[in-house]
């Protein structure tokens, strides 16, 4: 399995506030509304179509204030993978966030999409941090 790790992002919130959002798919999927079709979500799973490809995901593990682990659900992505959204609270108003993706790619796929996966992880982490930093304080 190959591992891709995003650049660390700073979120000016306590880890528990960030966790409350990232630990539920029904909180996350509205951000995808203009990018995907046929979006459905519950607290623990979601599915959507992107560029004609159906994606099904489910939350496999949660550690409050620390991380969530997401895996492909049955009938979804045809590759074995897992990704984590990890949080490390530095202070009450400073949490570091990063994404880690472990995916089983053959050599050809790794050469074709490896750099794109790294770039996508960095963009997603940056987008989550930007959205959390821009949201009103609770």
Q: What are the residue ranges of the model-derived segments?
A:
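Short secondary-structure boundary/capping segments
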Residues: 1, 38, 59-60, 86-89
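Hydrophobic ligand-binding cavity/cleft-lining segments
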Residues: 1-40, 45
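Short, highly charged C-terminal tails/helix-capping segments
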Residues: 129-138
């Amino acid at each position: 399995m190959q591992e891709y790790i995003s650049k660390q992002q700073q979120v000016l919130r306590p880890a528990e506030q960030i966790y409350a959002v990232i630990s539920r798919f029904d909180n996350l999927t509205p951000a995808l509304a203009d990018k995907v079709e046929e979006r459905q979500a519950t607290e623990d799973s979601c599915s959507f179509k992107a560029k004609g490809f159906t994606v099904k995901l489910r939350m496999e593990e949660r550690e409050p204030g620390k991380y969530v682990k997401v895996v492909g659900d049955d009938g979804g992505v045809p590759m074995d993978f897992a990704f984590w959204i990890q949080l490390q609270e530095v202070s009450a108003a400073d949490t570091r966030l990063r994404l880690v993706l472990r995916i089983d790619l053959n050599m050809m796929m790794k050469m074709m999409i490896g750099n794109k996966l790294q770039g996508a992880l960095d963009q997603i982490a940056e987008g989550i941090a930007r959205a959390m930093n821009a949201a009103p304080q609770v």
